[in-house]
């Protein structure tokens, strides 16, 4: 069982060393879940004397006003009889104190280091471990004494500040409250009882200690309180008799003081029947036993909390990404890895592993065909325009059989309108590829970590897509131009010819420009244009995929990688500049994760040894 108190001691020290003081923060706290005994009392309640009686040493700063200005985590370790007593501070890990006057001075000095030589308070605890054959295994947290007024040099808020600090400790469900009250004052005015009642109204977590019993007015006693009639708690009240100021001035040692305390309770008629559960020795043993019991009952819940929090911390650290490398090679490698991750996510969108690539197919299967169908050839193939172009094409010599030049001009003027849908298809795919770049950037966690790199990768990707768009537009429009530049002769050869039995055309020269003849030309040209549209409907997507989609998959960041290899370390560093808030958060998370893993290892070691 003693291993359990030692276990909590180790975890408490780790908490303080790694910055977990149980304060409200954006980080999970282990400190608040650890069972502890918090010592609470007013400034004149005898709180310090009780602690020194439990330890058996003079070691706490004394004086008027607020002497305890930081929480003191006092960890007592019982060692073998005959061993020399010593003390250690967490902030001085390799220094042993055998002179307890020096311990008192170090407590005062360490307090001043945190608060300055003022009368301010701080919630950052001091950890003091005392090793002695004359103590029980126990951990106590000495809190600043409650006060009702601020003294000179203290802010007006000091009364509330101390109450808030004390309350922040004792309101935790795993905290045992050691409420120190002087017997020579009305219990109804006890600062310790008042604040403990606020957070523990049933008294299940509160242990009452009554001091200054020997200083009560003659004819009065504390029997009603000690027997639980005046104020009932779950645990019996414990009375103690501390050294008087005269004893302290005369350096009366603790062994003699404990002996006189025992004699007082055994010889005083009012308390004789309670003597076996009175005194600082009984208090220390009772607290040690109770703390062991509480720790044992809380360990499973603490283990569960630790495991859950470790998983949460690891997940958040993964989201925040790794810290930046210091050397140029490490920075370059980090940038390349991030870019490769982004590039793979972009490819996954195109290949259907992630959503979005299907929209490109929609351009080819719906948008382009619909645009081709919407083309209007009324102007090019109107009777007036057909007559005009055929007449102009004939020049001064009318055509003999078929107006070939007129056909060519009419077909070319019609096919040229296909450039619009072709360009629109290229632009639509370009827009979709840019959207996929932005999606891939938002899904690449490491790019969120480095805003500068995110901007550069985004700009480089868009630049590449624009070059690919321009090349795709050139190649795609070239397909249209090729259709305009060379007609499919077989289409016209397969058309039926109107000739008489003698092999002569049925139309005379004079009726070649009538409406029926012109209408037939228009119908023929429209059929040819529709055939070309059907061909381009399949060849335009091929050109776009080859020039844009395939090329984006193959070389989206090639130009950026070329430039990256030329960059100096200063430029590389600028790309990996992080938001300072993220850097601070990662550092804090790493320290907190170290704490939880350390606690996990300590608990596992104790469980293994049992």
Swiss-Prot record:
Record key words, sorted: Cell cycle, Cell division, Cytoplasm, Cytoskeleton, GTP-binding, Hydrolase, Microtubule, Motor protein, Nucleotide-binding
Keyword Signal recorded: no
Tissue: Expressed in seedling root tips and root elongation zones, young root nodules and young leaves.
This protein's GO CC annotations: cytoplasm; microtubule; phragmoplast; plasma membrane
A biological-process GO annotation: receptor-mediated endocytosis
Region (G2 motif): 67-69
GO molecular function terms attached to this record: GTP binding; GTPase activity; microtubule binding
Region described as G3 motif: spans on this chain: 142-145
Annotated spans, G4 motif: 211-214
Binding site for GTP: 44-49, 212-217, 242-245
Region (G1 motif): 41-48
SMART domains named among the record's database cross-references: DYNc (SM00053), GED (SM00302)
Stretches assigned to the Dynamin-type G domain: 31-300
Domain of life: Eukaryota
Domain GED: 518-610
Region named G5 motif: 241-244
Quaternary structure note: May homooligomerize and heterooligomerize. May interact with CALS1 and UGT1.
Function noted in UniProt: Microtubule-associated force-producing protein that is targeted to the forming cell plate during cytokinesis. May be involved in attaching Golgi-derived vesicles to microtubules which direct vesicles to the forming cell plate during cytokinesis. Possesses intrinsic GTPase activity in vitro.
More info: The term phragmoplastin refers to the location of the protein to the phragmoplast across the whole width of the newly formed cell plate, unlike phragmoplast microtubules which are concentrated on the periphery of the forming plate.
Protein name: Dynamin-related protein 12A
């Amino acid at each position: 069982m003693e291993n359990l108190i030692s276990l909590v001691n180790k975890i408490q020290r780790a908490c303080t060393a790694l910055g977990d003081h149980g304060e409200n923060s954006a980080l999970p706290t282990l400190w608040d879940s650890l069972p502890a005994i918090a010592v609470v009392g007013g400034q004149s309640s005898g709180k310090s004397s009780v602690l020194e009686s439990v330890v058996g040493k003079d070691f706490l700063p004394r004086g008027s006003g607020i002497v305890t200005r930081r929480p003191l985590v006092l960890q007592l370790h019982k060692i073998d009889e005959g061993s020399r007593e010593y003390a250690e501070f967490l902030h001085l890990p390799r220094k042993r104190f055998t002179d307890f006057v020096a311990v008192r001075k170090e407590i005062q000095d360490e307090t001043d280091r945190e608060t300055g030589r003022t009368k301010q308070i701080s919630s950052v605890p001091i950890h003091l471990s005392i090793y002695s054959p004359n103590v029980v295994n126990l951990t106590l947290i000495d809190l600043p004494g409650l006060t009702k007024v601020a003294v000179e040099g203290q802010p007006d808020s000091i009364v509330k500040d101390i109450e808030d600090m004390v309350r922040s400790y004792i309101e935790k469900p795993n905290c045992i409250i050691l409420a120190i009250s002087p017997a020579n004052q009305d219990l109804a005015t006890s600062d310790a009882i008042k604040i403990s009642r606020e957070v523990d109204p049933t008294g299940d977590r509160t242990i009452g200690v009554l001091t200054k019993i020997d200083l009560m007015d003659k004819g009065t006693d504390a029997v009603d309180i000690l027997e639980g009639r005046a104020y009932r708690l779950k645990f019996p009240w414990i009375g103690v008799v501390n050294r008087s100021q005269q004893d302290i001035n005369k350096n009366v040692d603790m062994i003699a003081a404990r002996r006189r305390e025992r004699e007082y309770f055994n010889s005083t008629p009012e308390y004789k029947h309670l003597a076996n559960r009175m005194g600082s020795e009984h208090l220390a043993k009772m607290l040690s036993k109770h703390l062991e019991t509480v720790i044992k009952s809380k360990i499973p819940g603490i283990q569960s909390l630790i495991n859950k929090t470790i998983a949460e911390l690891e997940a958040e650290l993964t989201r925040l990404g790794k810290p930046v490398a210091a050397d140029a090679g490490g920075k370059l490698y980090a940038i390349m890895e991030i870019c490769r991750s982004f590039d793979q996510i972009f490819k996954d969108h195109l290949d259907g592993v992630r959503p979005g690539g299907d929209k490109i197919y929609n351009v080819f299967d719906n948008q382009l065909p619909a645009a081709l169908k919407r083309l209007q050839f009324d102007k090019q193939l109107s009777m007036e325009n057909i007559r005009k172009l055929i007449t102009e094409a004939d020049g001064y010599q009318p055509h003999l059989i078929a107006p070939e030049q007129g056909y060519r001009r009419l077909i070319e003027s019609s096919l040229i309108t296909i450039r619009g849908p072709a360009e629109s298809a290229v632009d639509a795919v370009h827009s979709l590829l840019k959207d996929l770049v932005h999606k891939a950037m938002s899904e690449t966690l490491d790019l969120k970590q480095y805003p500068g790199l995110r901007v550069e990768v985004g700009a480089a990707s868009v630049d590449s897509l624009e070059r690919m768009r321009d090349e795709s537009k050139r190649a795609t429009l070239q397909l249209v131009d090729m259709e305009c530049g060379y007609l499919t002769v077989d289409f016209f050869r397969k058309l039926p010819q109107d000739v008489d039995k003698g092999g002569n055309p049925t139309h005379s020269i004079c009726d070649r420009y009538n409406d029926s003849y012109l209408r037939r030309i228009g119908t023929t040209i429209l059929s040819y244009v529709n055939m070309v549209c059907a061909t381009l409907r399949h060849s335009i997507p091929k050109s776009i995929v080859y020039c844009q989609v395939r090329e984006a998959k193959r070389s989206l960041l090639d130009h950026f990688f070329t430039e990256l290899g030329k960059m100096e370390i200063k430029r590389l560093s600028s790309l990996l500049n992080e938001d300072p808030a993220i850097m601070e958060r990662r550092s804090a998370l790493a320290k907190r994760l170290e704490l939880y893993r350390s606690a996990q290892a300590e608990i596992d070691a104790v469980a293994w040894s049992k």
